[in-house]
Structure formats: structure tokens, C-alpha cells
């Protein structure tokens, strides 16, 4: 696995719930690809998850991936919570169904296709990759709003 890819992901939501968007900046051997999309009625957490899923789905073969997000929800979910959710049949410690389990399961499936290193950055402090992903996520929101 010598293919190394950088993914910068972000989600945005105007209202929570409300119209939302996701954005991904993919960098491979210096070449950049931008991905974005949105949904009419969603949450910020769903859009953060969707960005990571869509970024990983865009990779056609197994890769080493450095995925950078500003979402503590995604970071904690993937690195801390998911192992126990899976053991409990996608239930929380309080025996409640995991919120956004559909997307967590999709993310788990995509992560298992690759060797992913997860990185967290604070949002909106000028990190170039994160700022680009944020702009793309907002483009996703704008396109959804324009279709109304």
C-alpha cells in the first residue's frame, strides 16, 4: 500500500436540524480533488460523518489515508465509542440506539477498506485544508438551499 492520500473533511448545517452540506478536499501526489454535497433536512453531525464517508468512498483502491477533521464527534466516535457500540449491537451504554448508526456503519465499512490515520484540527483557525473543506461544505448547503 504505497498510495498515500490526504483527506480534509467538514460538515455544515444552517439550523440544527436544517439544510446541511459536507465537503472534502482530497490530495493525492499533489493533485487536488474537491467533493461536496448536501441534504435539505439534516444535522451538523450527520454532515460531518457524511464528509468522511464520501471522502473514503471516492478512493477506488486500498490506500493509506490521513483523514483530518475538526469534528470531536467523529474523532471520539471512531476512536473511542464505536468498538463498544458494535459489541452492544449499536446501542449506547444506556442501551439506547446509537444516533446516526446508519452513517457510523457506513463509515466503519469504508474505514475497513483502507489504512486510516485520524487527525483532529480546531476548526476556523486558518488551517488550509480544513478551511477548504469548510468552504466546500458551505457550497453544499448553498446548493441545497438554491434547489428549494
From Swiss-Prot:
The keyword Protein biosynthesis does not apply. One of its GO terms (molecular function) is nucleic acid binding. Mg(2+) 2 binds at residues 10, 134. Gene3D superfamilies: Ribonuclease H-like superfamily/Ribonuclease H. Mg(2+) 1 binds at residues 10, 48, 70. The keyword Magnesium applies. Residues 129-148 are annotated as: Disordered. One of its GO terms (cellular component) is cytoplasm. It holds the Pfam family RNase_H. It is an enzyme of class 3 (hydrolase). It is found in: Cytoplasm. One of its GO terms (biological process) is DNA replication, removal of RNA primer. Belongs to the RNase H family. Endonuclease that specifically degrades the RNA of RNA-DNA hybrids. Monomer. This is Ribonuclease H. It comes from Pseudomonas putida (strain W619). The gene is rnhA.
Amino acid at each position: 500500500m504505497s498510495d498515500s492520500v490526504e483527506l480534509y473533511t467538514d460538515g455544515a448545517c444552517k439550523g440544527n436540524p436544517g439544510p446541511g452540506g459536507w465537503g472534502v478536499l482530497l490530495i493525492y501526489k499533489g493533485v487536488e480533488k474537491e467533493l461536496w454535497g448536501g441534504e435539505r433536512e439534516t444535522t451538523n453531525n450527520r454532515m460531518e460523518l457524511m464528509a468522511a464517508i464520501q471522502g473514503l468512498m471516492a478512493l477506488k483502491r486500498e490506500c493509506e489515508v490521513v483523514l483530518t477533521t475538526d469534528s470531536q464527534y467523529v474523532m471520539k466516535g471512531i476512536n473511542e465509542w464505536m468498538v463498544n457500540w458494535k459489541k452492544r449491537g449499536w446501542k449506547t451504554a444506556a442501551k439506547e440506539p446509537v444516533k446516526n448508526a446508519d452513517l457510523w456503519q457506513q463509515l466503519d465499512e469504508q474505514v475497513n477498506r483502507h489504512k486510516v490515520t485520524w487527525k483532529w484540527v480546531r476548526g476556523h483557525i486558518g488551517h488550509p485544508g480544513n478551511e477548504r473543506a469548510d468552504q466546500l461544505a458551505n457550497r453544499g448547503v448553498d446548493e441545497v438551499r438554491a434547489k428549494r
